[in-house]
Amino acid sequence: YALLPWSDMLTGKAARLDMARALLRNTLGERAAALDIALDLPAFGKSGVAAGIDRQLLAGLRAAAKARRLRLSSVQPRLIAELSAQQKQLNDGWLACLDLGWLTLAGIRDGEISSLRNHRASTAEPAILAGELAGLLAAESATVNGKKVLISTSAGAAPKLAGGWETT
């Protein structure tokens, strides 16, 4: 994932896609070249989010659907789906998505995404993962005033956080 900061010079889809490619290349290096990138549709003047999926994985999903005479009409990144569902509820707070090997932290300020961090998790062990999440929250706490953290996990229970964070 990459946060696409608002710029009045980059309002078209092609310009936003170029920015997303550059940001993902900066984060992922050469692996970014293998991604199919999707952009959200932010309101004018607001930052947006780009998500990348491995092209071969997407092609495999499409082929599997076609082999079963199905049509794959949409593949939606979990972070985008979670943001859509929870953004207004959080208002000033954090959304943490814990996936196998990755921790993604989105800061929401005044109902809009204001920061986004991807972190390769060192383990799936809840206590250690809680420490890594707490470290990211501490490092990013200047960007969002809220102490509310919605934790979405693809497997297992959400880790418990110390330090006054209100988790849901």
Give each language-model segment a name:
Residues Y1-T168:
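Hydrophobic/aromatic-enriched cytosolic interaction surfaces used to assemble or bind macromolecules
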